[in-house]
């Protein structure tokens, strides 16, 4: 780390260091900076508040500051104020040009409703049960003039999504097709609504201006990680006293049944999706 610091200092001659990670390695880099008179700003991750929010007993269920705000404060403390001028990954454009996703499908036609579904996440505590999600897919697929795009990665996920695509009309799996991240993100910018877990797909869809119906289990929006400009009405979750049990969803369910997810009805998800769909053709 000392060698890394020396190389960075020699190459860039920086006069400020912003630590947006606040772990042992970045703490050491910050120490080296301070020893050389370089101004340091460290993000406040709010660890104490997160512990109070996720502990099993005497839980303090209050919304914490968003991670975006914590980033802004870290820049501000070092003299680099961040203005709130972000309009999405595609700038002032509502979406990416149609040719950007041409490798995946034809351009969207008038009256067609496009729905994206990203049903997986890194940890079990953040994944809506597959059997229940299939009911969501089947119900949405029965809506006229609707196409559903399934997003996922990995062999096991691809098998599940390919199975759904075979069983339901107008459902297409993109898992394992290797269209590339830019093309898939461009497609997401054109869909009417994305169904996602508390995962990267939730954030990516939000960043391209697509409404997201997010499903929350072991984690909670109060931890500060909800999607950019996401409506609370589109966050599907149950008011359980044990929620949230962790910030990132990695802890096993102490109940053993993940009722926080299995207790969510497929229809409650469908209802939130439908209100984002445009009118059907001829209506």
Task: Give the positions of each predicted feature.
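Catalytic machinery of carbohydrate-active enzymes
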Residues: 1-283
């Amino acid at each position: 780390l000392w060698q890394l610091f020396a190389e960075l200092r020699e190459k860039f001659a920086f006069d400020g260091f912003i630590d947006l990670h606040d772990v042992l390695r970045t703490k050491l880099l910050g120490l080296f900076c301070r020893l050389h008179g370089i101004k340091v700003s460290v993000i406040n991750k709010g660890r104490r508040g997160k512990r109070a929010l996720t502990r099993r007993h005497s839980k303090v269920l209050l919304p914490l500051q968003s991670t975006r705000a914590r980033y802004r404060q870290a820049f501000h403390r070092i003299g680099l104020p961040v203005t709130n001028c972000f309009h999405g990954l595609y700038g002032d454009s509502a979406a990416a040009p149609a040719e950007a996703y041409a490798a995946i499908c034809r351009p969207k036609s008038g009256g067609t409703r496009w729905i994206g579904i990203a049903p997986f996440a890194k940890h079990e505590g953040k994944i809506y049960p597959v059997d229940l999600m299939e009911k969501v897919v089947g119900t949405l697929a029965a809506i006229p003039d609707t196409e559903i795009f399934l997003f996922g990665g990995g062999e096991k996920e691809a098998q599940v999504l390919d199975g759904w695509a075979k069983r339901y009309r107008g459902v297409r799996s993109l898992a394992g097709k290797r269209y590339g991240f830019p093309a898939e993100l461009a497609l997401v910018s054109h869909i009417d609504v994305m169904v996602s877990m508390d995962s990267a797909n939730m954030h990516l869809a939000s960043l391209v201006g697509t409404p997201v119906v997010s499903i929350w289990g072991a984690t909670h929006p109060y931890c500060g990680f909800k999607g950019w400009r996401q409506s609370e009405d589109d966050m599907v979750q149950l008011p359980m006293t044990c929620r949230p049990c962790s910030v990132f969803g990695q802890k096993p369910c102490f109940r053993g049944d993940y009722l926080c997810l299995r207790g969510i009805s497929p229809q409650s998800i469908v209802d939130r999706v439908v209100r984002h769909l445009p009118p059907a053709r001829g209506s």
